[in-house]
Design a protein with these regions (language model features):
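Catalytic-core segments of class I nucleotidyltransferases/pyrophosphorylases
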Residues: 87-177
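Conserved beta-loop-beta/alpha segment of the NTase-like Rossmann-fold superfamily
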Residues: 3-84, 108, 112, 120-125
Length: 179
C-alpha cells in the first residue's frame, strides 16, 4: 500500500522466511524494523511505541519481542526469560519441553529489530524444527548466541486476539468498539 512497499512470500516456508523475503524492500535501511502479524489488528500504537522504546534500552537490545499472558497459553510459544529479566529465547508451542510449557508469558508475535543487525539474524535462521519451517522466533536465540541483548514488552492479552476467521473478526470488532 503506497507509499510503503509490499512483498509477497512465494512459498509459505515460515515466518522467518517471510521476513527474509521482505528484507529486499529494506535494502540500505538501518533504522528500527517493526515486524507485526496481520492477524493481530488490535495492537495499540502505544504498545508499538513501548516495543520500539525497549529496543533503545540500556543494553541496546538487538530485538524486542511483544509478550502477553493469555488465559490458555497452550497454543502459544513461550518467552524464556532469565533471572535478570533478559529475554533468552522464544520457544514455539510444539517444540516446547514440558518445563517450558509451564511458562505463562507467551509470544505475542510483534518484534522490533535493530535494522543494522536484522539481515545477519534472519540469514542465520534454520528449519530444523517440528514443522521444518524457518521460525522468526529463532532470532532471539541466535542474537543471544552472538552476545547481543534481547528484551520483551508485556501487553494485555486483549490486544493480541488473533483474527483468523469470521468469528474471530466479530469478537475483535466487539472488543474494539468496547475500547
Amino acid at each position: 500500500v503506497q507509499p510503503h512497499a509490499s512483498v509477497l512470500q512465494p512459498e509459505p516456508l515460515g515466518t522467518g522466511n517471510a521476513v527474509r523475503v521482505a528484507l529486499a524492500a529494506l535494502d540500505g535501511f538501518t533504522g528500527d524494523v517493526l515486524v507485526l502479524f496481520g492477524a493481530d489488528p488490535l495492537v495499540r500504537p502505544e504498545t508499538l511505541k513501548c516495543l520500539l522504546a525497549a529496543r533503545q534500552g540500556p543494553d541496546v537490545p538487538a530485538i524486542a519481542v511483544l509478550g502477553f499472558r493469555p488465559e490458555d497459553p497452550s497454543l502459544y510459544g513461550r518467552l524464556v526469560v532469565a533471572f535478570d529479566g533478559a529475554l533468552e529465547a522464544v520457544v514455539e508451542a510444539r517444540d516446547a519441553t514440558p518445563e517450558q510449557t509451564k511458562i505463562g508469558l507467551c509470544n505475542g508475535g510483534g518484534m522490533a529489530f535493530d535494522g543494522k543487525r536484522i539481515k545477519e539474524l534472519i540469514a542465520a535462521i534454520g528449519n530444523d524444527n517440528a514443522r521444518n519451517e524457518f521460525y522468526l522466533t529463532d532470532v532471539v536465540a541466535i542474537a543471544r548466541d552472538r552476545g547481543w541483548a534481547c528484551a520483551y514488552v508485556e501487553t494485555d492479552a486483549d490486544e493480541l486476539i488473533g483474527v483468523n476467521s469470521r468469528a474471530d473478526l466479530a469478537h475483535a470488532s466487539a472488543d474494539e468498539l468496547a475500547r
